[in-house]
């Protein structure tokens, strides 16, 4: 360190010694603390490859993660239109037409808002250019296995943006055992390879959001750290804030480096089954049958169908009565409701989507040289059993995996298996062993 002299200057930025905190002397040159810090940042940017963490920030300070080149936001002309989004969703999601239309419009408007922020003045009308477009997050309500998560991840795949899924049941208010809400952002950041700019244009799906409803309609004297407390913690994140995210996850503490993420451009989609919400709606309108079914038919209507009928009359006040605080409900203005899946819908899910479960099984066996075919009656039997289990489309894969176990086990080692036909009887027995002859029953090759 050189002795104090107001005439000494940094050889790089030309600032005098009284303009900087430190001035380091070398053989005929001087460098200030600000230029040293700048050099460190330049080295970090050049050496950082996305996997090796950047150099630690000085004690008490924060250093932003060096940014890799990010894809720019698409222009308004490049954005897929709602009808294009709808057609893409149709390839992967069966039914749920109203929900797909709601999501298509909401997602299009969200990324149109981002395009407007990136290109101010794009409207061309001066009084409209000054209008600020607010973010509209989405709430999806539907029974288990109806396609809530599938819709969200399909949207993210089409738009080619980072997508992360979080479970609301693991979250607690800051200071209590459990995950901080900022860990949701860390998952998105990890999917984006720690690229902050890329993560800030992504989509986060928060599942089981109904599980953080407060325990009673009236505010409680005791702390509700996994219910109302989590809703309060999520408010700013949903609305848009600069959040400090610990890069290693876990709880934050004052002496660790944090990555700052702006959530104002992140689209949040929350989903939940909201079991019992139909009772709240029916109580509000004062009708037990809801007017959607004839008198005397109530006993024949399933709980899922009763829920679907009730959701047609859903109002924000019903969600508040259920246990969502008014501020939280207000930050999810777009609501999409999903219908329960009947047997016909489950049959379609087995065969029609691009990545249908039966198509996946056929592809796996074709790789072993085996052609697989399902009789229509077998498909109907699988759908019937899945409907009986009351877990929606999730049951389909479990049934098919159980049914195909023996075939998948034998096929890679057997050259005599060229064609397999699955019947309804096999589905009912959950076994395909009769299709596979035991090696001892095959004719022995003639000796030379």
Swiss-Prot record:
GO terms for biological process: cell division; proteolysis involved in protein catabolic process. Keywords: ATP-binding, Chaperone, Metal-binding, Nucleotide-binding, Zinc. GO terms for molecular function: ATP binding; ATP hydrolysis activity; ATP-dependent protein folding chaperone; protein dimerization activity; unfolded protein binding; zinc ion binding. One of its GO terms (cellular component) is HslUV protease complex. Residues 50-76 are annotated as: Disordered. Gene3D superfamilies: 1.10.8.60, ClpX chaperone, C4-type zinc finger domain, P-loop containing nucleotide triphosphate hydrolases. SUPFAM superfamilies: Glucocorticoid receptor-like (DNA-binding domain) (SSF57716), P-loop containing nucleoside triphosphate hydrolases (SSF52540). Zn(2+) binds at residues 10, 13, 32, 35. InterPro entries: AAA+_ATPase, ATP-dep_Clp_protease_ClpX, ATPase_AAA_core, Clp_ATPase_C, Clp_protease_ATP-bd_su_ClpX, ClpX_bact, P-loop_NTPase, Znf_CppX_C4. Pfam families: AAA_2, ClpB_D2-small, zf-C4_ClpX. SMART domains: AAA, ClpB_D2-small, zf-C4_ClpX. ATP binds at residues 143-150. Residues 1-51 form the ClpX-type ZB domain. Belongs to the ClpX chaperone family. HAMAP family: ClpX (MF_00175). ATP-dependent specificity component of the Clp protease. It directs the protease to specific substrates. Can perform chaperone functions in the absence of ClpP. Component of the ClpX-ClpP complex. Forms a hexameric ring that, in the presence of ATP, binds to fourteen ClpP subunits assembled into a disk-like structure with a central cavity, resembling the structure of eukaryotic proteasomes. This is ATP-dependent Clp protease ATP-binding subunit ClpX. It comes from Synechococcus sp. (strain JA-2-3B'a(2-13)) (Cyanobacteria bacterium Yellowstone B-Prime). The gene is clpX.
């Amino acid at each position: 360190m050189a002795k104090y002299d107001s005439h000494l200057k940094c050889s790089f930025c030309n600032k005098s010694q009284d303009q900087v905190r430190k001035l380091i002397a070398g053989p005929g040159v001087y460098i200030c603390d600000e230029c040293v810090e700048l050099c460190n940042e330049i080295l970090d940017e050049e050496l950082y490859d996305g996997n090796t963490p950047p150099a630690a920030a000085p004690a008490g300070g924060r250093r932003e993660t060096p940014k890799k080149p990010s894809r720019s936001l698409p222009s308004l002309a490049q954005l897929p239109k709602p009808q294009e989004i709808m057609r893409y969703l149709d390839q992967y999601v069966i039914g749920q037409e109203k929900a797909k239309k709601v999501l298509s419009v909401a997602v299009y408007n969200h990324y149109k808002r981002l395009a407007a922020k990136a290109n101010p003045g794009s409207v061309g009308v001066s009084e409209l250019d000054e209008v600020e477009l607010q973010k509209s997050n989405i709430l999806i309500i539907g029974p288990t296995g109806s396609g809530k998560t599938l819709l969200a991840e399909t949207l993210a795949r089409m738009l080619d943006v980072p997508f992360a899924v979080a479970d609301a049941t693991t979250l607690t208010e800051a200071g209590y055992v459990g995950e901080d809400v900022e860990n949701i952002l860390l998952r998105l950041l990890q999917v984006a390879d720690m690229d902050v700019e890329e993560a800030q244009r992504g989509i986060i799906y928060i599942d089981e959001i109904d599980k953080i409803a407060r325990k009673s309609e009236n505010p409680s004297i005791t702390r509700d750290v996994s219910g109302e407390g989590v809703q309060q913690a999520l408010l700013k994140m949903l609305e848009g804030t600069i959040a400090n995210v610990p890069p290693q996850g876990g709880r934050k503490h004052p002496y660790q480096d944090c990555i700052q993420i702006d959530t104002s451009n992140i689209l949040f989609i929350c989903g939940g089954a909201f079991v019992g919400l139909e009772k709240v709606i029916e109580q509000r309108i004062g009708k037990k049958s809801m007017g959607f079914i004839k008198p005397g038919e109530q006993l024949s209507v399933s709980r899922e169908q009763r829920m679907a009928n009730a959701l047609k009359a859903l109002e924000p006040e019903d969600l508040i009565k259920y246990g969502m605080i008014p501020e939280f409900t207000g930050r999810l203005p777009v609501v999409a409701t999903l219908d329960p899946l009947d047997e016909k819908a489950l049959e379609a899910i087995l065969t029609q989507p691009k990545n249908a479960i039966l198509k996946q099984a056929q592809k796996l066996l074709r790789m072993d040289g085996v052609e697989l075919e399902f009789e229509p009656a077998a498909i109907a039997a699988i759908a019937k059993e899945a409907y009986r289990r009351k877990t929606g489309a999730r049951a389909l894969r479990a049934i098919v995996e159980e049914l195909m176990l023996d075939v998948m086990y034998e096929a890679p080692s057997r050259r005599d298996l060229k064609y397999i036909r699955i019947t309804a009887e096999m589905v009912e027995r959950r076994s395909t062993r009769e299709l596979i002859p035991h090696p001892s029953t095959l004719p022995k090759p003639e000796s030379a």
